[in-house]
């Protein structure tokens, strides 16, 4: 509460915004009571007490919205509708944000950090669950958000998964029979639009950050601060995600898949080093990105990585280079340019390349592979590979992918990482360097077979 700039007298904490003229009062006596500012509509007292941890998340969410400039009269808590038995929450949404005309603009479902948030988001991805039920009740809603906040290591951390319910014309035109948000009239059709047309795309920032403007919700450009170092608990999740993607798309060539994964690692490392202020390694969703732009960005990063780290020149011409070349021919009609670009796209994308998890030799297979590629990129885009200090978990992650991706046959067996660590720690490397110099050590074979030669 002190971090949120509440002042307190005994058990009563108060936040006053003298500029906008509103007050939030939290009384910790007894079961606790939260008094929201005048103008905020409170339909039920369920979230206005301190008996549940989720209520603290709702409190912090409302505080943050007000702090960013949303007016109290545009915020409504716990609007309620008759809900089927499979919808949790009793048919009550946590926070509804209305626009200046009083229409529903944003629906927010607050969850506690960790398991509850993850479980409910999984349900959302399965059938739409609470969020899509609420959205059908308020069809003017433009955005849905699942939100959590937590106090961790003396710092307030926030997590949000945001879904846009606004249609994208270009995306709809790419389907023969598109399913749109606009024409959806029930939960299943609204979810089908998100699931099929927009590939369940969600983004993680655009509402609660310091730079956000009320009612201007859009994914902000990603920078190095948006990604985090991997921890022990994340490793198994990434293994499972990797194998799930391969299984879902019937990718049988594990060794090829691992090769392409290594290429993605290389592209991501280059991105973090060269584009830390504006990362390029991410999937921006079908409403803002497309498969061609994504692969073009990845190829440019991969080309730079091969040249910088491996000294290998990779032939690749990106889209912007072609655009610039055409500017030299001012008298050429646009039709000629479009035709040549079409042929160029076929040659560049509709063949096997450095990110082909499956064989690609036509447009249909390009799109099929692109679906795999997008999921692989999403798996890695929030992981920080370039760290200031060695990250053992990152090494363990790569080792796990290696074990899973490369068939171990005679002469190819990989020694488990703990054994390798033990072997290296027992080598008298420091004494050897002191007595014979650094140039003496040429190579160290970290496998059980080579160990017999050291002995």
Predicted features, each with a name:
Residues 118-174, 180:
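Nucleic-acid nuclease catalytic cores
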Residues 12-22, 46-50, 73-102:
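Active-site metal-binding core of divalent-cation-utilizing nuclease and nuclease-like domains
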Residues 415-455:
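Conserved S-adenosyl-L-methionine
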Residues 31-37, 96-108:
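Active-site beta-strand-loop-beta-strand hairpin of nuclease catalytic cores
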Residues 101, 110-121:
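Short beta-strand-loop-alpha-helix junction that forms the active-site gateway
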Residues 198-279, 283:
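Non-catalytic accessory regions of SAM-dependent methyltransferases
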Residues 1-66, 169, 204-243:
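Charged, often low-complexity linker/regulatory segments
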Residues 266, 273-403:
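Long recognition/docking surfaces used for binding and targeting
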């Amino acid at each position: 509460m002190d971090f949120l700039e509440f002042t307190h007298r005994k058990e009563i904490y108060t936040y006053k915004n003298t500029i906008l003229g509103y007050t939030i009062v939290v009384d910790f006596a007894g079961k606790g009571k939260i008094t929201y500012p005048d103008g905020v509509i409170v339909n039920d007292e369920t979230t206005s007490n301190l008996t549940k941890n989720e209520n603290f998340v709702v409190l912090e969410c409302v505080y943050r919205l007000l702090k960013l400039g949303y007016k109290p009269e545009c915020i409504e808590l716990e609007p309620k509708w008759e809900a089927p038995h499979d919808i949790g929450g009793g048919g009550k949404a946590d926070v509804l944000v209305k626009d200046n005309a009083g229409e529903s603009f944003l629906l927010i479902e607050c969850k506690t950090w960790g398991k509850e948030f993850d479980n409910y988001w999984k349900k959302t991805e399965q059938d739409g669950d609470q969020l899509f039920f609420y959205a059908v009740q308020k069809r003017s809603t433009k955005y849905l958000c699942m939100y959590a906040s937590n106090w961790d290591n003396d710092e307030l951390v926030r997590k949000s998964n945001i879904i846009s319910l606004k249609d994208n014309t270009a995306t709809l035109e790419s389907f023969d029979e598109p399913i749109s948000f606009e024409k959806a009239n029930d939960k299943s059709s609204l979810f089908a639009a998100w699931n099929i047309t927009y590939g369940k795309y969600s983004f993680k920032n655009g509402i609660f950050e310091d730079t956000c403007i009320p009612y201007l919700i859009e994914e902000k450009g990603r920078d190095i601060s948006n990604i985090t170092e991997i921890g022990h608990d994340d490793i198994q999740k990434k293994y499972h995600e990797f194998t799930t993607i391969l299984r879902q798309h019937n990718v049988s060539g594990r060794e090829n898949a691992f090769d392409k994964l290594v290429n993605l690692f290389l592209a991501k490392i280059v991105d973090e080093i060269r584009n830390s202020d504006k990362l390029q390694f991410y999937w921006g969703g079908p409403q803002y990105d497309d498969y061609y732009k994504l692969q073009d960005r990845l190829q440019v990063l991969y080309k730079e990585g091969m040249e910088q780290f491996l000294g290998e020149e990779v032939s690749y011409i990106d889209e912007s280079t072609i655009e610039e070349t055409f500017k030299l021919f001012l008298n050429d009609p646009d039709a000629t340019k479009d035709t040549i670009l079409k042929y160029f796209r076929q040659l560049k994308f509709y063949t096997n390349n450095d990110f082909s998890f499956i064989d690609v030799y036509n447009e249909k297979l390009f799109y099929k592979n692109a679906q795999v590629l997008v999921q692989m990129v999403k798996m890695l885009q929030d992981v920080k590979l370039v760290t200031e200090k060695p990250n053992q978990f990152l090494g363990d992650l790569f080792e796990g992918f290696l074990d899973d991706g490369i068939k171990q046959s005679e002469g190819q067996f990989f020694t488990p990482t703990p054994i390798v660590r033990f072997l290296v720690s027992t080598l008298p490397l420091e004494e050897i360097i002191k007595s014979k110099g650094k140039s003496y050590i040429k190579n160290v074979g970290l496998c059980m077979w080579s160990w017999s030669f050291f002995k």
